[in-house]
Amino acid sequence: RRSSSAASDVYKRQTLNISVSIEQELSEISDENELKEFLFEMGMESTGLEKLIKTGYELLGLCTYFTSGPKETRAWTITNSTFAPEAAGKIHTDFKKGFIRAETVSYSEVISAGGWLKAKELGNVRSEGKDYLVKDGDIMNFLFSS
């Protein structure tokens, strides 16, 4: 069995301490404000599960972008350094083949503006081409020809 010392060094540095009993208690809190208060009292910024997911994504070199339409909003997992056409191809191969551009805005800008349409009105939605590297948290609308 071969092992990469670089890979093992990364795994040695990444350790998470997660209390199962605290996570169980957190999972039973349905009120968002109560959850925030509990985390604050425990001196935690986020749940252990959230930390585990974030660390896993970082170690695997993954990020998430979103698409949203009238029927659903969906998260898509891609590798870091993915160009817009390849990200579009995760949805459907026709999106990649006929890629024209992607209307793109960050999640934080959409939240600050109060929605996609407001972000667009404020000029926060960018038109990105084939050389755009998708960033974690991007919300994208792909324009393509069939």
Q: What role is predicted for each listed range?
A:
Residues R13-I18:
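Conserved beta-strand/loop subsegment of P-loop NTPase cores
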Residues F144-S145:
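Short, surface-exposed secondary-structure boundary micro-motifs
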Residues R1-A7, Y11:
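Single conserved hydrophobic/aromatic residue that forms the stacking wall/gate
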Residues V20-E72:
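Anionic-ligand-binding alpha/beta catalytic cores of soluble enzymes and soluble regulatory domains
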Residues V20-E28, E72-N141:
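Nucleotide-binding motor/catalytic cores of P-loop/tubulin-like NTPases across gene-expression machines
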Residues Y11, L49, S81-A84:
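Generic structural signal for well-ordered, non-membrane alpha-helical segments
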Residues A6, E34, F83:
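Short Gly/charged-rich anion-binding patches and loops
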